[in-house]
Amino acid sequence: MDLSIIIVNWKSKEYLRNCLASILAETKELNYEIVVIDSASFDGAGEMLAREFPQVQFIQSQENLGFSKANNVAFQASTGEVLLFLNPDTELVGPAINQLYTTLRELPNAGIVGARLLNTDGSLQTSCVQAFPTILNQLLNAEALRRLTPGARLWGMRALFALGQKPEPVEMISGACMMMRREVFERTGQFSLDYFMYAEDTDLCFKSRQLGLVNYYVGGAVIVHHGGGSSQQARSNFANVMVFESNSRFLKKWRGASYSFGYRIAMSGAALVRVVTLILLSPVLLVLKGVGRWRSACSKWLAIFRWGIGLWRWVR
């Protein structure tokens, strides 16, 4: 088997249907299998697959395994020499999988390769490649600033704006679309179970580079990542905080407890500044953004502040 495409589903049945349809329509001349695991969302994906995509191997988990463990379980059921971990809320634009596969085969030093991700409206999803998190780049991390200084090494986004179609070395590939050789995935120790959600892709890309391999961005392989499926359907404070918690765990694992503690302090300080700013500018923001969005922003940054000072804890 040339390729195993592994997809973790969680309340994303409609996205999954479109994702699979695009794979079948655009992926030619490859001997591939598709393995879908539902992480206890029980959204009817299994019935839909049996009815519309009987060639897809389906695994129904009775518990929510989280992204890492669910992918690892599906991996055990796969047989391909190459693996593609793909989000259910993605759709191929042309033969993206073939292009990634060809690139991986042509580059013996490649660890993980990833595609150019677009938002639903066709705009570039700048998070498809990033630098590994540091206190500085996370403290300054704002979409407006990233767009003003896209070539700054701080963000690790230069590859997105490179001329031509040749693969570009990058630090980190988005977990929405990650392709690698099976033996590389095994050598990294698979997805780390240190994270329930978020930073799993960061950790895997870091381990790939630790092996002396190079992660590549393939700009000619284009995939739409709707970003509205799975956990982002309703971005709760839990999900918002888990981004920071997972980054903290990554930094503790690879840069030490002191650095991770510094990250928490910096992020809690930044969150407090945001909360105070939202309150001080509330007369203007309530008019411009509305009560609902203002309250949501206040709630988000207050939760992150509480996390940073140790008043919010999630134990796994």
Residue ranges and their predicted role:
Residues 83:
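Short aromatic/hydrophobic "clamp" motif used to bind/position activated sugar donors
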Residues 132-170:
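Short, flexible, basic/aromatic active-site loop/helix in glycosyltransferases
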Residues 206, 210-287:
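Active-site-adjacent helix/loop segment of glycosyltransferases
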Residues 22, 30, 38-47, 63:
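A conserved acidic beta->alpha catalytic loop
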Residues 91-128:
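Conserved donor NDP-sugar-binding/catalytic core segment of glycosyltransferases
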Residues 164-165, 171-222:
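A short, conserved alpha-helix in the catalytic core of glycosyltransferases
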Residues 1-25:
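N-proximal low-complexity "stem/linker" segments adjacent to membrane-targeting elements
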Residues 61-78, 99:
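Glycine-rich, basic loop-to-helix element that forms the pyrophosphate-binding segment
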